[in-house]
């Protein structure tokens, strides 16, 4: 367990370098009901990915499961968090095995997911404040850097391990970039989406919209995303963005993260199954498909989340 504090050097009168905290004794922790809710969310995400989101190369463009795992490590007690990690490790192994991945590679991928989640959780606990309010602009930027750096390091280690197992690859950079974006976007979007209902539930009701307006905006976003990625016309994709901005103004950060997460999964699933403008443009190029889906996901995040953070700071 990472849990240390900085002390003042009496001879020099200054603090030494920071140290990471995965757990703080003063931090409030959640119990079994929260663990069960997060575990059900983790299983649901894994099942959705397995059933709907794998492309022709058996890969995915966006992996939000690790974000749920990070949220659990930040919310649960050390003992419950360890049990949660072990349970998710088992689910991940089964997921990879069902996906026709041999046991050695399944262990590598699942272990890297665990390491990524633990590292990202420790960095988030250390640098994003005790309240873990990732809806605030400054903490959101900090967390975005944490997600990007953690995923980039995990992708690099993963490519090295795959090189040792399978031999040198002819496309290491694109494989590393896809891995980094897949897990980085998963952390960036899914971690706040999983944290907000437990840490800042009020952020689901802070905007000026009526109670019925919020789920209605989510339903419109889902419908537009399905329509945009069910047909081969790129212009329809642009219709999603104004609704996400409207959600930021009328529904608040909680609904924004839920909308971005839902939009991302729908876009990934339909593209992976050969539907929509991205699949039409690159029907046999999985890296290109994945990168364009990742670009769309990043665009939806950049369109709505900073606006919600700015409005939250103003309010």
Annotated model-derived regions:
Residues 4-9, 13-61, 68-168, 191-262, ...:
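Short helix-perturbing small/polar motifs within transmembrane alpha-helices
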Residues 172-186, 285-295:
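Short aromatic-rich membrane-water interface segments that cap or initiate transmembrane helices
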């Amino acid at each position: 367990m990472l849990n240390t504090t900085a002390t003042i050097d009496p001879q020099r009168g200054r603090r030494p370098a920071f140290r990471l905290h995965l757990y703080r004794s003063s931090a409030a922790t959640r119990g079994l009901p929260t663990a069960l809710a997060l575990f059900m969310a983790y299983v649901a995400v894994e099942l959705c990915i397995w059933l709907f989101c794998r492309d022709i190369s058996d890969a995915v463009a966006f992996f939000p499961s690790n974000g749920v795992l990070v949220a659990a490590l930040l919310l649960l007690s050390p003992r419950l968090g360890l049990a949660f990690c072990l349970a998710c490790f088992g689910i991940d192994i089964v997921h990879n095995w069902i996906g026709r991945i041999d046991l050695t590679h399944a262990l590598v991928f699942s272990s890297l997911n665990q390491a990524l989640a633990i590292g990202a959780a420790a960095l988030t606990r250390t640098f994003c404040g005790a309240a873990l309010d990732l809806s605030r602009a400054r903490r959101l930027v900090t967390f975005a850097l944490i997600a990007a750096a953690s995923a980039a390091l995990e992708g690099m280690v993963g490519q090295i391990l795959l090189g040792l197992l399978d031999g040198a690859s002819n496309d290491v950079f694109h494989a590393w970039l896809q891995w980094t974006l897949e897990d980085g976007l998963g952390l960036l979007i899914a971690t706040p989406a999983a944290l907000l209902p437990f840490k800042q539930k009020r952020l689901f009701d802070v905007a000026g919209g009526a109670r019925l307006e919020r789920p209605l905006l989510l339903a419109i976003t889902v419908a537009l995303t399905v329509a945009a990625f069910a047909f081969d016309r790129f212009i329809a994709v642009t219709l999603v963005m104004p609704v996400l901005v409207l959600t930021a103004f009328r529904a608040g950060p909680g609904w924004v993260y839920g909308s971005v997460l839902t939009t991302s999964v729908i876009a990934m699933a339909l593209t992976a199954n050969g539907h929509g403008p991205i699949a039409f443009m690159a029907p046999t190029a999985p890296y290109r498909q994945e990168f364009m889906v990742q670009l769309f996901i990043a665009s939806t995040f950049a369109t709505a989340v900073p606006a919600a953070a700015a409005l939250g700071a103003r309010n």
